[in-house]
């Protein structure tokens, strides 16, 4: 019994920390992206800088630090389930993103960490045959 209580406390602390990740504004940076088809087969690979900034209320996706090449919008729903902060788990986000000439897209973003790799999968509902998988090089909590 004496060993169980400390283990439960440690488990609760990790769970609280993992949930806290979802309440923070985070900037993810990627330098490698894969373009996938609807069967998750790689169609091409890019070595460009992509940043994805996520908060509880908004998403901003930027390509090569170009303010004219970004999508941004409001988070409609978010589900966060991490067992180990930024290492093992998943966040799924439903958002409405606007780009360029006010083109609006319903989007799904999945941030996932497993086997020592973290990536972000970006799917636009009006482009079901194309997904972008961005491998996260680094992340920074903001604010």
Segments from the language model and where they lie:
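Short, solvent-exposed mixed-charge patches
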Residues: 21, 141-143
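Short, hydrophobic/aromatic-rich segments at coil-to-beta transitions
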Residues: 23-29, 87-96, 116-120
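Short beta-strand segments that buttress and anchor functional surface loops
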Residues: 61, 93-100, 109, 120-124
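Contiguous, well-ordered beta-strand patches that form the walls/edges
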Residues: 65-106
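Bacterial Sec-dependent N-terminal signal peptides
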Residues: 1-25
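N-terminal glycine/threonine-rich, aromatic-flanked beta-hairpin/loop signature
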Residues: 48-76
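Short, exposed beta-strand-loop hairpins at the edges of beta-sheets
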Residues: 108-133
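Tryptophan-anchored aromatic micro-motifs
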Residues: 21-42
């Amino acid at each position: 019994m004496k060993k169980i209580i400390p283990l439960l406390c440690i488990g609760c602390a990790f769970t609280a920390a993992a949930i806290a990740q979802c309440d923070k504004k985070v900037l993810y940076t990627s330098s490698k992206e894969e373009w996938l088809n609807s069967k998750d087969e790689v169609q091409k690979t890019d070595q460009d800088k992509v940043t994805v900034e996520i908060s509880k209320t908004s998403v901003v996706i930027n390509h090569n630090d170009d303010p004219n090449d970004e999508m941004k919008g409001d988070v409609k729903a978010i589900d966060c389930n991490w067992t180990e902060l930024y290492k093992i788990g998943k966040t799924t986000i439903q958002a409405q993103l606007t780009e360029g000439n006010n083109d609006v897209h319903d989007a799904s973003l999945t941030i996932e960490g497993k086997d020592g790799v973290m990536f972000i999968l970006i799917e636009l509902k009006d482009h079901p045959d194309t997904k972008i998988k961005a491998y996260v090089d680094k992340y920074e909590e903001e604010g």
